[in-house]
């Protein structure tokens, strides 16, 4: 039974972190559908997705009219619709308290990455329970 992954992190906005692209490639090769949801402006999210993750991430959703920003679930629902995937097959991966809240509001399990915007203690204070210390940990978590 394959669990589909929804990548909600903004890890691509500034640049991709070491090890992220190979992990995303591996997940795609394993059949996972991948998306980015970001509160950054939509055209920039799409452009950065093409620059850093072309051919890997199938949907990139940014701030746009008619779609509420995170932590509302709207962007996640839009991404899932674009991917053609139901929420019960998705996991939200992010690096902030907003991502933890977005996952909760979307009814998705969340993996909080520790190489991004916030540290582990802060994320725990905001409800995070699953952590990836390095990108490879995401694959291990999904294969449990």
Q: What does each model-found stretch correspond to?
A:
Residues 1-8, 12-13:
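Single conserved hydrophobic/aromatic residue that forms the stacking wall/gate
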């Amino acid at each position: 039974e394959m669990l589909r992954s929804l990548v909600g992190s903004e890890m691509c906005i500034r640049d991709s972190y070491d090890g992220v692209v190979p992990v995303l490639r591996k997940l795609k090769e394993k059949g996972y559908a991948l998306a980015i949801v970001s509160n950054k402006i939509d055209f920039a999210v799409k452009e950065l997705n093409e620059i850093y993750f072309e051919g890997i991430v199938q949907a990139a959703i940014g701030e746009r009219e008619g779609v509420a920003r995170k932590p509302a679930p709207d962007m996640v629902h839009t991404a899932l619709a674009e991917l053609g995937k139901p929420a019960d097959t998705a996991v939200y991966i992010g690096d902030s308290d907003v991502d933890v809240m977005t996952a909760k509001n979307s009814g998705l399990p969340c993996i909080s990455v520790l190489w991004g915007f916030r540290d582990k203690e802060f994320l725990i204070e905001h409800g995070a329970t699953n952590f990836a210390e390095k990108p490879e940990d995401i694959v291990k978590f999904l294969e449990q």
